[in-house]
Amino acid sequence: MQNFIFISPNFPTNYWQFCRELKNDGMNVLGIGDQPYDELKPELKDSLNEYYKVGSLENYDEVYRAVAFFIFKYGRIDWLESNNEYWLERDAALRTDFHITSGFQTEDMPRIKYKSKMKEYYRKAGIATARYHMVDDLNGCKAFIKQVGYPVVVKPDNGVGASDTHKLSNDEELKTFLACKAENHPDVSYIMEEFVRAEVNSYDAIIDASGNPIFEAGNVSPMSIMDIVNDNDNSIYYIIKDLPEDTRAAGRAVVKSFGVKSRFVHFEFFRMTENQASMGEKGQIVALEVNMRPCGGFTPDMINFARSTNVYKIWADMIAFGGTDMPVGEHYYCPFAGRRDGKNFVYSHEQIMQKYQKNIKMVDRIPDALSGAMGNQMYVATFSTREEMEQFYSDVLAVTDGDAAAAQAALSQVLALGEPTTKALTLKPNLSPAVKPTTAVTKIPTRAVTKTSRKGRK
């Protein structure tokens, strides 16, 4: 039996499903977290063979001792993962210290965590990147801006999501940013990039031990997460019904360039919505950033709804067996609509639930830790056509206050982007465009599942 340590299995709240599928596949699933055992969801308790509570996951020594305890009790650890961006460096440090070779090591972290380091590997994959400058002083930043023009985007070189990301449109905003950085984050390295006029398209895939995708999907974020966070706006994004071929090719090329194996990945690309001389034409793919973990929040569930499948199982099967026999069924659009508290919406929650009762798959309050980028009240639904999805967005997000006309116009402008306008992806001729094409799912022989008992440690 293989031993799998899952770091922070209780957050995000849907991650217990990864543990359940691992256990169903006969893995010995060992959780380490800082939530008291009695407060864990019953489903998570049932999905773990044992749980070790630490005082704080931020305390490396405590987590180190927890891993050492599991090794003493169960022997060699085969896998250690959190599937969580926040803990990727911690995961790598633990693997390195305990010689767990099934995932990234500490030496791998710069290229997958630092946005400036990612660009080299994107270029190796033959994919265009935005020009950038490592933030130094006013003169250095202004020299870069003289080349690319305003606006520019600044963010931590090693950051999570859109946290502390800002669009600067003039010299005064630049000076304000530099002053705030000097006062609050003098030791944090920031990257400045030219602004890309685009929507975000993602490549979401489960990659096997040979670096081949066994499942592929993608989402579209027509609204900038940076703007959603900074403007306290509603949130929309959706799983696209069919993954565009240029996104697929770009995703596979990046998998190869970064040397990804045995992971669930979420790669983000800009799809340009207008021509930009420095990067290319409308519809072209431009690199944004790699995330060596599943897309955040409830997106794995949305992918399940959009593909009539179970990505938690596909991932667990990849870990346990190297492949999966989980089928992929009918494809749908799966939109996420996140309402922001404090807005006056035309349709009440009850009216939305009544009108879309046959379509809605999930309704919930967003955890505070995720609400900045996702809103406060979420609705997830499925639709066969884009027109149905657009009407859903118009109904859920329509407001009654004085800004109603402007809000509706902005939403209409976003939805008017329509299906991604694709361009043929041209890669460098000395680099193959991707790994060998695969079907959406790789078959494996049926394996017997070993039943295991549940143990807990408070």
List the predicted regions and their residue ranges:
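Short, well-ordered beta-strand elements within core beta-sheets of diverse protein domains
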Residues: H166, E194, I239, Q377-F383
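Peripheral (often C-terminal) accessory segments that flank ATP-dependent C-N-forming ligase machineries
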Residues: A316-K458
